[in-house]
Design a protein with these regions (language model features):
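Short acidic/polar segment at the start of the alpha1 helix of CheY-like receiver
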Residues: 9-13
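Charged docking surfaces used in two-component/phosphorelay signaling
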Residues: 14-22
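Helix N-cap/capping motif at the beta->alpha junctions
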Residues: 29-38, 60
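Short amphipathic alpha-helix used as the core "switch/output" element in two-component signaling
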Residues: 38, 61-73
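Active-site residues of response regulator receiver
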Residues: 52
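Receiver (REC) domain active-site loop signature in two-component systems and cognate sites
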Residues: 55
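Receiver (REC) domain switch/output surface
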Residues: 107-118
Length: 118
């Protein structure tokens, strides 16, 4: 089982993946939405998606909408550098929306546990 981490910033993506790996999860990295779709097509053992919000060409919410339209209903956690608005947190199909802050290790661990146990 893998968690797909999507972030256009390679360092941020690697840090998120390392955080998840330190919690016992296997990860795959994608650097944009198209790479993510390729990873999803290639790896049938992906159980959760963790995506950055702000990416060039296709944002995290646009990727979520695109995947839902294609019938992909994997849990989807969105990460943002901004404080998530209530509207963003209520995006249809979104499992969780978390702020990339000092609490991320704890909030991400809790959101992943809830998504996978859910």
């Amino acid at each position: 089982m893998h968690i797909l981490v999507i972030d256009d910033d390679p360092l941020a993506g690697e840090m998120t993946a390392a955080l998840l790996e330190s919690q016992g999860h296997n990860t795959l990295l994608a650097h944009d939405a198209m790479d993510a779709v390729e990873q999803l097509d290639t790896h049938s053992d992906i159980v959760l998606i963790v995506s950055d919000m702000h990416m060039p060409l296709v944002s995290g919410t646009e990727l979520l909408a695109m995947l839902r339209e294609q019938g992909n209903h994997l849990p989807f956690i969105l990460l943002t550098g901004d404080t998530p608005s209530e509207t963003l947190q209520q995006t249809p199909g979104l499992t969780a929306c978390l702020c990339k802050d000092a609490e991320l290790a704890d909030t991400l661990a809790a959101a992943v546990k809830q998504a996978l146990d859910g």
